[in-house]
C-alpha cells in the first residue's frame, strides 16, 4: 500500500498544504522546527487517529484555530481509498470514502504504518510505558478487536481508580462496586493479555532472524513478556481469569491504601534478551539499537503476513542516529517494496541507491518545494 497524496488544513504549523508522493521513497528535508516532523506526524495521525508525539489532540490544531483536518488518498492492491480525519476540541471524527465512521476502531488499520523515530531507540532502555505503547499501537493495526478491549479496559480502569481514591476515606460502603469493576477489568484484561501473547509470539518469529542477520550471526534475540501477575502463555482464558481474581483479592487493601490499581495489563512490561543477557541492563548501546531496529523491521514483515500488503514506513530523523552498517541494513531491507518517508536536515553522508530516485520535499516554515532527484 502507499499514500499518493495528502491535504492538511490548520494542522500544526501548516495553514494549508496539498502534496503528492512517490510510491517508493520520499525524503523530507528541512532545518529543525520548520515542519518536517509535523508532516511526518500528519501521515501517522491519518493512519492511527492519534499522534506518536502527544496525547493532547489540541496541540495538533494550528494556533488560534478551532479545528484541524488531514485528508489522504490511499492506494491498496485492489482499491483506492480516501481517508479523512477531523480534529476539534470535542474530539476526532474519521471518514472513509466520505462515510463517517461510528468508531475510530473501525477506521484504524485501514492504512498501516510503521514509525521509526529517535525515541524508538529508547524502546529497549526506556520506561515500561514506552514498551506497552509499542504493543498497543502495533497490535491495534492488525487486530481491531484489541483496540476495543483496550478502550473498554481503560474506561473501567479510570472508574476503578476513581473509586479506590474515594475508598481511602471510607472503604466499607463501596466494596460491592469495587468487586464489579474488578470483574470487568479482569474480563477485558484477560483478552488483552491473550492478544499480546499471540502478537509477541509472531514478533519473535520475525525479529530473531532479522537480529541474527544484523549481528552477522553472533547474537540471538529473545522477547519475553513480563505480566504483573503470575500467568503464562500456556494458560487458557479461564485459568488466567482465576489468577487475576486471586491476585486482586491479595492486593485489595494495598490498592485502597494507595488509591490506584496495582496489577493488570497497564502494569506489564517487555524484556529483551541477547544471548541470554538482559539488553536493558547488560547490553551495549549498539546491541540496544540493533534490538530496536530488529523490532521495527519485524513489524513490517509481521504486518505484511497479516494483511498481505506492506505498511508505509516513516523514518523520522532516525538515519542519522544509526551507524553506516545499520543504516545500510535498514535501507537494503526496505528497498523497492515499502513506501518510505525519510526526514532529515541533510542527505549529505547518506550514500545509498534507495535515496537516489527519491522525491525530495524541502520544508521551510510550513511551506514546501518538491523535486524528483534522479542523480
Curated annotation (Swiss-Prot):
It is found in: Cytoplasm. ATP binds at residues 30-37. Gene3D superfamilies: P-loop containing nucleotide triphosphate hydrolases, RecF/RecN/SMC, N-terminal domain. Its main location: cytoplasm. The keyword DNA-binding applies. One of its GO terms (cellular component) is cytoplasm. Transmembrane segments: none annotated. One of its GO terms (molecular function) is ATP binding. Keywords: ATP-binding, Cytoplasm, DNA damage, DNA repair, DNA replication, DNA-binding, Nucleotide-binding, SOS response. It comes from the Bacteria. GO terms for biological process: DNA replication; DNA synthesis involved in DNA repair; double-strand break repair; SOS response. The RecF protein is involved in DNA metabolism; it is required for DNA replication and normal SOS inducibility. RecF binds preferentially to single-stranded, linear DNA. It also seems to bind ATP. Belongs to the RecF family. This is DNA replication and repair protein RecF.
Amino acid at each position: 500500500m502507499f499514500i499518493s497524496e495528502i491535504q492538511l488544513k490548520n494542522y500544526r504549523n501548516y495553514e494549508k498544504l496539498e502534496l503528492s508522493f512517490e510510491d517508493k521513497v520520499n525524503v523530507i528535508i528541512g532545518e529543525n522546527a520548520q515542519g518536517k516532523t509535523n508532516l511526518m506526524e500528519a501521515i501517522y495521525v491519518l493512519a492511527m487517529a492519534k499522534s506518536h508525539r502527544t496525547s493532547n489532540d489540541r496541540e495538533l490544531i494550528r494556533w488560534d484555530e478551532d479545528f484541524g483536518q488531514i485528508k489522504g488518498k490511499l492506494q491498496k492492491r485492489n482499491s483506492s481509498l480516501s481517508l479523512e480525519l477531523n480534529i476539534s476540541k470535542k474530539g476526532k471524527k474519521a471518514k472513509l470514502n466520505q462515510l463517517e465512521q461510528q468508531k475510530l476502531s473501525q477506521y484504524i488499520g485501514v492504512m498501516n504504518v510503521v514509525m521509526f523515530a529517535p525515541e524508538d531507540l529508547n524502546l529497549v532502555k526506556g520506561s515500561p510505558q514506552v514498551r506497552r505503547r509499542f504493543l498497543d499501537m502495533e497490535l491495534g493495526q492488525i487486530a481491531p478487536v484489541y483496540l476495543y478491549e483496550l478502550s473498554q479496559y481503560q474506561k473501567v480502569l479510570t472508574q476503578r481508580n476513581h473509586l479506590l481514591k474515594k475508598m481511602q476515606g471510607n472503604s466499607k460502603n463501596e466494596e460491592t462496586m469495587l468487586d464489579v469493576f474488578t470483574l470487568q477489568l479482569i474480563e477485558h484484561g484477560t483478552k488483552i493479555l491473550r492478544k499480546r501473547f499471540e502478537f509477541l509470539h509472531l514478533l519473535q518469529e520475525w525479529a530473531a532472524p532479522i537480529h541474527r542477520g544484523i549481528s552477522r550471526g553472533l547474537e540471538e534475540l529473545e522477547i519475553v513478556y513480563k505480566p504483573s501477575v503470575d500467568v503464562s502463555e500456556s494458560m487458557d482464558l479461564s485459568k488466567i481469569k482465576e489468577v487475576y481474581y486471586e491476585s486482586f483479592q491479595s492486593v485489595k487493601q494495598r490498592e485502597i491504601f494507595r488509591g490506584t490499581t496495582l496489577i493488570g495489563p497497564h502494569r506489564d512490561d517487555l524484556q529483551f534478551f541477547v544471548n541470554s543477557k538482559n539488553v536493558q541492563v547488560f547490553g551495549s548501546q549498539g546491541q540496544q539499537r540493533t534490538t530496536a531496529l530488529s523490532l521495527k523491521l519485524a513489524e513490517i514483515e509481521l504486518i505484511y503476513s497479516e494483511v498481505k500488503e506492506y505498511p508505509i514506513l516513516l523514518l523520522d530523523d532516525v538515519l542519522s542516529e544509526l551507524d553506516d552498517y545499520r543504516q545500510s541494513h535498514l535501507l537494503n531491507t526496505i528497498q523497492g517494496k515499502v513506501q518510505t518517508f525519510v526526514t532529515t536536515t541533510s542527505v549529505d553522508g547518506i550514500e545509498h541507491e534507495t535515496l537516489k530516485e527519491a522525491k525530495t520535499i524541502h520544508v521551510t516554515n510550513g511551506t514546501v518545494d518538491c523535486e524528483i532527484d534522479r542523480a
